[in-house]
Design a protein with these regions (language model features):
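Hydrophobic ligand-binding cavity/cleft-lining segments
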Residues: 1-43
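NAD(P)H-binding glycine-rich loop region in Rossmannoid oxidoreductase-like domains
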Residues: 183-228
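N-terminal Rossmann NAD(P)H-binding glycine-rich loop of SDR-like oxidoreductase domains
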Residues: 144-166
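Hydrophobic-ligand binding "helix-grip"
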Residues: 27, 32-35, 41-109
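Alpha-helical substrate-binding/gating segment
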Residues: 315-324, 330-365
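Conserved Rossmann-fold NAD(P)-dependent oxidoreductase catalytic core, especially the SDR/UDP-sugar
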Residues: 230-272
């Protein structure tokens, strides 16, 4: 019982071990298909405790063992909160030139087949993160202080962990009572000292575009983005030492349906509610640009993660055999894996050559029919029940269905490609296999 698994990571042992000691490491290694959340990270790999939340109100408390702490060779943790024997030893040894043999030894009554997909995911994720980090450091080795709005959302949580494991300091800007290390942010009237000591801002906050496009909903979508962004950009302009102002944006700026037209950052904006909102959203960054701050608008495609967005909605349908293409399935889907989006945000902060709008999409868009076939194949389920066109209209209304569910946008990441940016998951099959722990299948 239990499992021992090894792989070689293309980074030296000190760097691999050090990565595990940084805040956010445990968040980066939790498989996205598992209903697990980090409640508290361990303050130390020698004797700290990490607490994870599980379904049903259960908690997984991993207590690190002082007797096994041997940097940079090993550390171990044991489960203390549940009646399940569990000891997880993490071992690191040199392997050739500037590489590390990483070995996980899990001692538990659970069979290896239950553990394998999780452990394989952790190794692949660790390798990918360290490879991407090496590329980021080739751009800039600076360690920055980055203020982040929307840090508790799907993207913000993952991005915070990526930045902190990269050696940066993250200052969450929050609208509730701030905890240690956070700052209170009033979107309509931010405090003059909010950005003091900050090198860069990543502004993610904004109301979800999901749901029916009622007048009230459209007002919330617009007002949660444009005015708060302008106020934050004005504050950035008045703050000494700020190097970069990076804001979320969306490919909705190109309009809901441009046929087979290839859309790049140089393409004209489209028509429709979302195009109007995104244009105003991007224009709201003007005060920062006018002050000489490098400003980047990350025009985000359809983010792929089982933890949120479209994929979270589709997964249960496909797992029960009820998934299928939407209408005729000819709509273009400009998708992006979550980790690739995070890498783009990190690059936007670090790369002095990057400014203005940047399409954050994978280099290979797919049609809706191809997307649904691929998802079904990865989940090993059929995709034989097409969703009629009126289905999204029932849920989202005519305008919402046209602008979201039925949108067709052939968007390419021309500026990133021109900059030599490397994607972790450039094609859909590999991305979905990684996200669902189906690599090698």
């Amino acid at each position: 019982m239990g499992l021992t698994y090894s792989s070689v990571i293309d980074a030296d042992r000190d760097e691999v071990f050090s990565w595990h000691t940084r805040p956010g490491a445990i968040t980066r290694l939790i498989p996205p298909w598992q209903p697990v959340r980090v409640l508290r990270e361990a303050g130390s790999l020698r004797d700290g405790r990490a607490t994870l939340t599980l379904p049903g109100g259960l908690r997984w408390v991993a207590a690190h063992q002082p007797d096994a702490y041997d940097p940079p060779n090993a550390f171990a943790d044991e489960l203390t909160s549940l009646p399940l024997p569990w000891r997880h030893t993490h071992q690191f040894s040199p392997s050739g030139h500037a590489a590390t043999l990483v070995t996980d030894v899990i001692e538990t009554p659970l069979p290896a087949r239950v553990l394998r997909s999780t452990v394989v995911y952790r190794h692949r994720q660790l390798a990918a993160d360290l490879t991407a980090l090496a590329r980021a450091r080739a751009i800039s080795q600076d360690r920055l202080t980055v203020a982040v709005t929307g840090s508790s959302g799907l993207i913000g949580t993952a991005l915070t962990a990526l930045l902190t494991t990269s050696g940066h300091r993250v200052v969450p800007l929050v609208r509730r009572l701030p905890r240690a290390g956070e700052r209170y942010w009033r979107p309509e009237d931010p405090a003059a000292e909010l950005l003091d000591g900050v090198d860069a801002v990543i502004h993610l906050a904004g109301a979800s575009i999901g749901g029916r496009f009622t007048a009230e909903r459209k007002h919330e979508i617009r007002t949660s983005r444009i005015q708060p962004t302008r106020r934050l950009a004005e504050l950035a302009a008045a703050t000494q030492g700020l190097r970069a102002f990076v804001t979320a944006s969306a490919i909705g700026i190109y309009g809901p349906d441009r046929g087979d037209e290839v859309l790049t950052e140089a393409s004209p904006r489209g028509d429709g509610f979302l195009a109007d909102v995104v244009a105003g959203w991007e224009d709201a960054t003007t005060p920062a640009t006018a002050a000489g701050i490098r400003t980047v608008q990350v025009r985000t495609g359809i983010v792929q993660s089982p933890r949120g967005g479209m994929l979270r909605l589709l997964t249960p349908l496909f797992e029960t055999g009820l998934g299928g293409r939407l209408g005729d399935g000819k709509q273009w889907l400009a998708w992006i894996a979550l980790d690739d989006l995070l890498d783009i945000y990190r690059r936007a902060v670090l790369d002095e050559a990057l400014s203005g709008p940047v399409n954050a999409v994978a280099p290979e868009p797919v049609r809706n029919a191809d997307y649904t076939r691929t998802l079904a194949a990865v989940l090993r389920r059929p995709a034989v029940l097409p969703v009629p066109g009126f289905g999204p209209r029932l849920l989202l209304g005519d305008e919402g269905a046209r602008e979201i569910a039925q949108a067709s946008q052939y968007v390419l990441p021309e500026r990133l490609t021109g900059a030599g940016h490397r994607f972790r998951q450039p094609e859909l099959t590999g991305a979905l296999r990684h996200l669902f722990g189906r690599e090698g299948t």
